[in-house]
Structures are given as structure tokens and as C-alpha cells.
Design a protein with these regions (language model features):
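N-terminal helical capping/dimerization or prosegment-like subdomains
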Residues: 1-83
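Short secondary-structure boundary/capping segments
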Residues: 4, 52, 84-86, 93, ...
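A generic structural signal for short coil/turn motifs at secondary-structure boundaries
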Residues: 21-24, 104-105, 171
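Glycine- and other small-residue-rich loops at beta-strand/loop junctions that grip anionic moieties
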Residues: 51, 105, 139
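Active-site metal-coordination/substrate-binding segment of hydrolases
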Residues: 70-136
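Acidic/histidine-rich catalytic neighborhood of metal-dependent amide-processing enzymes
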Residues: 109-171
Length: 171
């Protein structure tokens, strides 16, 4: 199946609910986001390992190439809870407003995954000396259970990492 355009990937990720919250009534599974990413990355030749962290909660570690070291492009697949009444647009629909794409998770941080898939596409037909790893964790917005599960699994990750979390350019 052909890879959707970056904008279509972005829209699909935004449309997939994945609220993480300590209040059970608001908490949602992130499986739909993980399935989208694993499908696209798998079609590109990545080896995809989906780790169930708890019921309905999953991490994805996708690797291209093999061996020690490498680069990890890391982010989380969940969003904060939202109130429809506080949005001027549908939070689960990618919408262009004043030349910017908006939607729940567009910046923090589902959009990161669409951007990195687009960025690495031209590199995938070249041999890699070390692996490229794409990591999507669950529950960063609430309990950090995805990151904890990854650490507890003890799987070595790359030598360097880029974390796509927005910072407001503050270290």
C-alpha cells in the first residue's frame, strides 16, 4: 500500500484518539496511533516491535538497519484530555488556520512522527552503518508508564537521540 502524504499521515494521527489521563473516565488507548505508525514504518522496511505496557497501552520501537549504536527519533503517542468547547476547530481533525496545521497533538506531539517519516524517506535507499530507531511511547502525558516499561525491558537503544517534544526553545 502506498505511503500517505505527510499531510494525510498528520491528519490520520490527529484523528486517532489517544488521550492519556490519570482519571479512568478520560483515559483512552493509544493502539490506533501505534497501528498507524507500525503500518507505515513496516511498509518502508522498518522492523516494528509493539510492546504492550498495560491493557490498551502500547509502545512502538521501529528499527531500520541493525547493530549497536544508531540514532533514536523519540516521541510519545498520547495527548492530554481536551474540552471541545475550548477549541475553535474540531480537535480531532487536522485544520489549516492562518497557514498552520492545528489539531490535538499536532505539536505535542503526533505531528513529529509524520515529519520524521517524511524526513527519513530519501535516506532509506542507502546503506546504514548504524540503525535508525523510531520510538513512540504511551502515557507520557500522565504516568510515564511507556518510558518506564521501555527502561525496565533493558533493551539497548541508540547512541544518540532526538526527542521531538516541543520546548519553546528553552533547555
Amino acid at each position: 500500500m502506498p505511503l500517505p502524504s505527510m499531510q494525510d499521515q498528520f491528519a490520520a494521527l490527529i484523528a486517532a484518539p489517544s488521550v492519556s489521563c490519570t482519571q479512568p473516565s478520560l483515559d483512552q488507548s493509544n493502539r490506533a496511533v501505534i497501528d498507524l505508525l507500525a503500518g507505515w514504518l513496516g511498509d518502508l522496511g522498518f522492523s516494528c516491535d509493539v510492546q504492550q505496557v498495560s491493557p490498551g497501552k502500547f509502545n512502538l520501537l521501529a528499527s531500520f538497519g541493525s547493530g549497536p549504536g544508531g540514532l533514536v527519533l523519540a516521541g510519545h503517542s498520547d495527548t492530554v484530555p481536551y474540552d471541545d468547547a475550548l477549541w475553535q476547530t474540531d480537535p480531532l481533525k487536522l485544520t489549516e488556520v492562518d497557514g498552520r496545521w492545528v489539531g490535538l497533538g499536532s505539536c505535542d506531539m503526533k505531528g513529529f512522527f509524520a515529519l520524521i517519516i517524511d524526513a527519513v524517506l530519501p535516506l532509506l535507499d542507502q546503506p546504514f552503518k548504524q540503525p535508525l530507531l523510531i520510538l513512540a511511547t504511551c502515557d507520557e502525558e500522565s504516568s510515564m508508564s511507556g518510558a518506564r516499561a521501555l527502561a525496565e525491558a533493558g533493551r539497548p537503544l541508540g547512541r544518540a537521540a532526538v526527542i521531538g517534544e516541543p520546548t519553546g526553545l528553552k533547555p
